[in-house]
Amino acid sequence: VLNTVSGLLHPKHGSVVFEGKDLKGVPAHKIVERGMAQVPEGRHVFLQMTVEDNLEMGAYTQPNSTIDAGIADVYERFPRLKERRKQIAGTLSGGEQQMLAMGRALMSKPKLLMLDEPSMGLAPILVEQIFDIIRELHTAGTTILLVEQNAQAALSVADRAYVLETGRITLSGTGKELMASDAVRKAYLGG
């Protein structure tokens, strides 16, 4: 779903509309320029580049005069990245790479941030930190589109939630409504 929204895949049916404009045929880099950024499953940071170089790569749509301020904002949100700014990204822990992937996406100043399985492979304490950051971003006005297997964590931050099965929406509601749903509790929350 996220690869279709971000222009990496083309929909066979339907359309993707963002801010009233159909994105059919719009190249992925132009979608980023329109205010959308994706943090892919598995992070996909530039492993041979430093933390700071990775962040600069995320700012390619921004004027050069704003890049330093953008990096400072990311370091404020992710202090661990500031400590590691000259370190090669491939040597970071999984949690640090997830922070870097999120920070790189934030460098483009997105209106819509798409996160694909941000908790995948992370220790529980890091999952909690990542979801705290997701809450902070949402509170600050960034719209978040989250795809996440950890239903409890995802529903705890969701204004709206959808359960997809084989590409079709089978349930929808607020995060609280789905958390209270017997079907969701039985299928996804172990109850």
Where are these regions (language model features)?
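Glycine-rich phosphate-binding loops of nucleotide-dependent enzymes
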Residues: 1-191
